[in-house]
Amino acid sequence: MAQPKLVPRMQAVPQPGQQVSFQRDGIEIARYHFGNESGRPFVFPLIGPSGRSVTRIGHPNDPQSHSHHYSVWVAHRDVNGVNFWEERGKNVGRIVHQSIEPFFDSADAAAVQTVNAWLDHTGKPLLTERRRITAQWLPNREWLLIVDLQFSATSEPVTLGKTPFGVMAVRMAKTIGVHDGGGTIRNSEGAANDKEIFWKPAKWVDYSGPITAAATEGATLFDHPANPNHPAVFHVRDDGWMGASLTFDGSRVIAPGKPLQLRYGVYVHADQPAREQLQERWEEFSRTPPFEFKPRGK
């Protein structure tokens, strides 16, 4: 009798409404949303070891003007002068899902691969983006979200303008924020909170704080050494958000036929790990190569 195939413990499971549920033994730890009503794909929730999400949608005290804060998302404020960061305005673009490429399930990781079009306000495509979202299981119910990105200019050179806004951002749960929950921001350079970390380069930035009355959890945003501006300048705020800036120091041009590839990680963890532990996790991540996107249609 043939041996039954093993059921992967980590699975990326398609859901109604253009969503993918990342599950460990059938229990969701994250969900990728790629419907076009939001103007950009995003990941929400990111479930920590306690069973609660360490991220949220929107600013807890200013939800109207920060409605574009979608938990974990990819965006940029200046793409050939078009604003892909905010949702409202005269020159606002949209990141529109085009297609899904293969799913991947295994014992300790699951992934989904998609194609997005970055369209200006007239619908003109500026960039084609290929994205791979991976959830990698770690000991003690912790896990790592890996975001691989490949940007290609569609027909003419595209300039990502100088700005601290973009491309990788995380909005933390209200109780984890420094202002609202008494949380703490730390970086790889030994600095703490907005005053010391804001607009400073680092390998990683961690945001930890209360998630229940008895538990502390958080997330660490990793910049990969293969990224062209590593170590990235981080834009952080005590109100609960952190982002890795790609073009803080100057613009970057993507020429046709010469795609830009990026890799980031978000480590979802229990407690407030020591800096040495976070550095060890970052070093493990730094040794992993960026995902190799195969030519489309092959």
Language model feature labels by segment:
Residues P157-P228:
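Active-site/ligand-binding surface loops and adjacent short beta/alpha elements
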Residues Q3-S67, Q279:
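Beta-strand-rich N-terminal accessory domains
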Residues E37-E87, G182-W204:
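Extracellular/lumen-exposed scaffold segments
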Residues H66-R141:
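Extended, loop-rich substrate-binding clefts of extracytoplasmic carbohydrate-active enzymes
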Residues I27, V115-A117, R130-R132, D148-S152, ...:
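Residue-level recognition of well-ordered beta-strand positions that form the cores
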Residues G35-S38, F42-P45, L138-T184, Q277:
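Acidic (Asp/Glu-rich), glycine- and aromatic
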Residues F44, I133-Q136, D249-R252:
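Beta-strand-rich interaction surfaces with strong enrichment in secreted/lumenal proteins
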Residues A219-K298:
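Beta-strand-rich recognition/accessory modules
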